[in-house]
């Protein structure tokens, strides 16, 4: 008989099958103990054929008992191997789960710090917007005063007909202020858009924190079940839990990287806004200086006196006023050149932001291909 080969190829027995095998073995032991009693109970006046058959039966029972003993040895060795393999598997799973939990806690702390930084930068942006609105109102008031003064000068002085360059510069200044207002409106829209993005990221951060809390609850439930004496989870459940944890860690890493990108974008926008505010301050001071230094308000009595003066004296007066007017135009030209520099800086920042966005897409594509 080839019983040992069958014992090697068959599947490992379950608990119910082991209990049945033990019952079968006990029954076989009892059956094996019967033949000598039956042989002793038989009368001595039997034939030799009958004794030969009994000897064959006894040999068969002995061989069966040996095979059963071998099977019992194999079963006990298999049980020992199973217990030895279960213990290191449990230890490795617990170690990996603890490492993943520590990583999740560290990433949660990093996300909290980034959210705090974003909120602080948004508060600074709101304050700067309020300052910009105040500066805009001051600029509008100064524009009104400049327009009134220019109207008085046009009505009172006749020498401005010989100065077409001054009129062209004034028209340039008038056309320049609406352009600044449009840029301010566009910057305000950008800040509102960034605020909406920050709110979206805060919502995603709350969802991630909820997922982490649910995972912690599940871990606590598993611990309670283990303490109550329930069966440990199988290998498939451990693998699924491990995959879920790895996916959560990947999501947290992607979220932290996107938060870093948003932080850099906000810093660039804040720098641009600071430069805008500085330029508006310079414009405001440049507007106040000619208003304070030059006698912009001319009375009707002075105009009457100028009309009475001869043309030679009028030309001398206009020649005296020419350097002051040229100084104001020079200051305005400097302001417009500073605006061009600011535009160039903004274009450089936009190129930098596009490079950052492209790198983020390149990083996300291999991650999606791997998943």
From Swiss-Prot:
Polar residues bias locations: 223-240
GO MF entries: DNA binding; DNA-binding transcription factor activity
Keyword Nucleus: yes
Residues modified to Phosphoserine: 98, 202
Keywords per UniProt: Coiled coil, Cytoplasm, DNA-binding, Nucleus, Phosphoprotein, Transcription, Transcription regulation
GO terms under cellular component: cytoplasm; nucleus
Residue span of region Basic motif: 121-188
Compartments, record wording: Cytoplasm; Nucleus
Top-level division of the source organism's lineage: Eukaryota
PTM description: Phosphorylated by MAPK1/ERK2 and MAPK3/ERK1.
Region (Leucine-zipper): 245-266
Residues in coiled coil: 96-148, 177-289
Residues covered by region (Disordered): 223-246
Region (Helix-loop-helix motif): 110-120
Note: The helix-loop-helix and basic motifs form a SPZ1 specific bHLH different from the classical one.
Function: Transcription factor that binds to the DNA sequence 5'-CANNTG-3'(E box) and the G-box motif. May play an important role in the regulation of cell proliferation and differentiation during spermatogenesis.
Name recorded for this polypeptide: Spermatogenic leucine zipper protein 1
Organism: Bos taurus
Lineage, uppermost ranks: Eukaryota, Metazoa, Chordata, Craniata, Vertebrata
Gene for this chain: SPZ1
